């Protein structure tokens, strides 16, 4: 399930996060709190997992913001787990299996591919809505596949190939539009709520939006961990995980 990403999430974040925190932290905490308070979950059988970068960014402090918000809401019994290559916190009972890790990488790769084919095709489509319809078809299919217990690289590679082939088959206009790159803070860059639906705004103004891949951000993080271990005396164990991540 994708967490809600509406204006109400921002309002929820403002309620539970101090007002000198950065905008992305408001949205992240707001999304989590809105989901937990929605009534859709048994609050005695849920846990929150959040990444920690270990750097100077407020992203390292999200876990503290979330715990404080849960305490203010009377939900301090909900565990908040840290997911970090730096090993900032240890979480007993929480293990990432190889199968889970591979499926997470596949999901990220699918997302990056969708951004490339959708943003490249939609501004030029002959039949309005055809690109979004094909995207929705594949999104539903891949969500079901990622949730099942089956695992295989063959299915994954075939999906990548078919996605490209089907988007290539969409009729497009033979015109050229200005290409506008979207850069900035990672959450604001990728979240339509945070960036005021910038991609659709650019397309409505006659441009083609170009978005960097999400996976590139993680590759940067892996390379950064390797550099810190080699040049700055950080733990060598992070190099092993980073090398696996890069490969």
Question: Language-model features: where?
Answer:
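An N-terminal assembly and electron-transfer interface module characteristic of large anaerobic redox
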Residues: 1-247
């Amino acid at each position: 399930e994708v967490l809600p990403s509406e204006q109400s999430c921002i309002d929820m974040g403002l309620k539970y996060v101090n007002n000198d925190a950065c905008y992305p932290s408001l949205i992240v905490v707001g999304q989590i709190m809105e989901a937990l308070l929605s009534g859709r979950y048994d609050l005695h059988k849920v846990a929150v997992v959040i990444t920690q970068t270990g750097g100077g960014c407020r992203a390292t402090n999200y876990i503290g913001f979330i715990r404080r918000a849960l305490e203010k809401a009377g939900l301090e019994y909900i565990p908040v787990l840290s997911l970090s290559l730096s090993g900032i916190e240890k979480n007993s009972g929480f293990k990432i299996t190889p199968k889970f890790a591979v499926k997470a990488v596949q999901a990220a790769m699918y997302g990056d591919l969708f951004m490339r084919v959708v943003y490249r095709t939609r501004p030029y489509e002959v039949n309005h809505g055809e690109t979004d319809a094909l995207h929705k078809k594949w999104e539903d299919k891949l969500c079901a596949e990622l949730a099942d217990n089956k695992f295989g690289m063959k299915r994954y590679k075939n999906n990548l190939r078919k996605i490209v082939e089907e988007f290539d088959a969409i009729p497009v206009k033979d015109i050229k539009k200005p290409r506008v790159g979207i850069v900035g803070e990672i959450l604001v860059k990728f979240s339509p709520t945070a960036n005021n639906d910038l991609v659709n705004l650019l397309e409505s103004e006659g441009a083609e939006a170009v978005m960097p891949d999400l996976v590139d951000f993680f590759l940067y993080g892996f390379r950064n961990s390797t550099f810190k271990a080699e040049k700055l005396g950080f733990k060598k164990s992070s190099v092993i995980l980073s090398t696996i991540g890069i490969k």
